[in-house]
């Protein structure tokens, strides 16, 4: 018996004008995700994913390159306006926002959504160098 041939559908790129940039800046890495208003991810990039390994991942320059990479991919969806949400205390917070601005997006708002515990878990011990 002959199997019916599968039709290959071309993926339709949706046109999104307003997006949300989620920047998660930890001490070890920076993750930049650009989504639509509903939270569906359009593009993302990390400092480690764009070629930085080890201690170079946690630099502001690595966060800048990751933000540019995610921004260029989001431009294909037609994103023009961005609302930026920054989470975490990492060194790549500001440079990622500046890189998104330089990519050509109009940034409408910058919000800090870092989770702050109401005396939750015990924090890690202080480093002795």
Curated annotation (Swiss-Prot):
GO CC, alphabetical: ribonucleoprotein complex; ribosome
Pfam hit, one: Ribosomal_S11
Keywords: Ribonucleoprotein, Ribosomal protein, RNA-binding, rRNA-binding
GO biological process: translation
Gene Ontology molecular function: any one: rRNA binding
InterPro entries: Ribosomal_uS11 (IPR001971), Ribosomal_uS11_bac-type (IPR019981), Ribosomal_uS11_CS (IPR018102), Ribosomal_uS11_sf (IPR036967)
Domain of life of the organism encoding this protein: Bacteria
Family: Belongs to the universal ribosomal protein uS11 family.
Oligomer status and interactors: Part of the 30S ribosomal subunit. Interacts with proteins S7 and S18. Binds to IF-3.
Biological role: Located on the platform of the 30S subunit, it bridges several disparate RNA helices of the 16S rRNA. Forms part of the Shine-Dalgarno cleft in the 70S ribosome.
Protein name, as recorded: Small ribosomal subunit protein uS11
